[in-house]
Regions:
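N-terminal Rossmann NAD(P)H-binding glycine-rich loop of SDR-like oxidoreductase domains
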Residues: 5-24
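Conserved C-terminal active-site "lid" loop/helix of NAD(P)H-dependent oxidoreductases
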Residues: 38, 207-224, 239-272
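NAD(P)H-binding glycine-rich loop region in Rossmannoid oxidoreductase-like domains
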Residues: 50-86
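Glycine-rich NAD(P)-binding loop of the Rossmann-fold in SDR/ketoreductase-type enzymes
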Residues: 53, 82-93, 129, 137-140, ...
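NAD(P)-cofactor binding segment of oxidoreductase domains
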Residues: 68, 80-105
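Catalytic helix-loop patch of NAD(P)-dependent Rossmann-fold dehydrogenases
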Residues: 85, 118-157
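Conserved Rossmann-fold NAD(P)-dependent oxidoreductase catalytic core, especially the SDR/UDP-sugar
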Residues: 93-130
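Alpha-helical substrate-binding/gating segment
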Residues: 161-168, 178-199, 207
Length: 277
């Protein structure tokens, strides 16, 4: 049985991007999702309908798994109960699959693991986690699971803290957080090819002029982004419309504001922050 790269969440927005990109490099792919298969199916790829929370179905893939590219998740803020199944239990099953297969894991983490850091703060991969919601919290869990599985079982993993993966940035925040689809595929490819990967974290961003994050982890993999959000800057509204003071204060933007119940920062604090922008 030929070993394949298993992509979870392969029918999702970014799962399709990564599947198409890896297929273009003549990779042998096994695509999985609870949803219908992506159309058209990438050339040479096989699809199986699998629920991430079905442990037996996930682990049954081990004999034919060369690597796991785990993009399956609820991709937005939801209640804890909704997040728990796909994002927490499902991620555990994906790491168990990698362990049983003796395969490496590429984990789709998120910038929302650090969302409550203030804007203007330059972060690196070792900056403290400050998730901005249950979605971000679930990605913290996935990154820490990568650490556990490396230390305890020797499972290599790359956690990619994906910024804003879109065809082009949609607002001025994304001038800092954007990663093009092509660069996302390049970063996944770098993680699959790297020798001595161990357990690493990398920021999933393009070569943006206005970046908030120092991407030493990705550079050490040989990742060379080809795109920069700055080319879109003149077309974007500099006011970041629709964002209140909480969203504008923190790197996570609107995720920080959703469900926020503390007293909002005082006007003095807001003005101090604006002065330092």
């Amino acid at each position: 049985m030929a070993a394949k790269i298993v992509i979870t969440g392969a029918s999702g927005r970014l799962g399709r991007v990564v599947g198409e990109g890896l297929a273009a490099g003549a990779r042998s792919l096994l695509l999985t999702d609870i949803a219908d298969p992506p159309q058209p199916l990438p050339r040479g790829a096989e699809f199986r309908r699998i629920d991430l929370t079905d442990k037996a179905a996930m682990l049954a893939l081990a004999p034919e798994t060369a690597a796991v590219v785990h993009f399956g998740a609820l991709p937005a803020e939801r209640s804890f109960e909704e997040i728990l199944g796909p994002n927490v239990i499902g991620t555990y099953h994906a790491f168990e699959l990698a362990r049983l297969a003796g395969a490496r894991m590429i984990f789709a983490s998120s910038n929302h693991v650090i969302g409550f850091h203030e804007r203007g703060t330059l972060l690196d991969e070792d900056s403290v986690m400050r998730p901005d919601g249950f979605y971000g919290l679930s990605k913290c869990y996935g990154e820490l699971m990568g650490r556990l599985y490396w230390d305890k079982h020797g499972v290599e993993s790359l956690s990619i803290r994906i910024g804003s993966a879109r065809p082009e940035p949609r607002d001025v925040r994304q001038l800092r957080t954007w990663i093009s689809h092509d660069d996302l595929v390049r970063l996944v490819e770098a993680g699959l090819a790297a020798e001595g990967l161990g357990c690493r974290v990398a920021w999933g961003i393009s070569g943006n002029t206005r970046r908030w994050w120092r991407d030493n982890g990705a550079e050490s993999l040989g990742y060379k982004p080809q795109d920069d959000a700055e080319r879109y800057a003149d077309a974007l509204d500099p006011a970041e419309p629709g964002s209140g003071p909480v969203a504008l204060r923190y790197q996570g933007g609107g995720f920080c504001a959703e469900g926020y119940s503390r007293d909002e920062p005082s006007p003095a604090d807001i003005f101090a922050w604006m002065k330092d922008r």
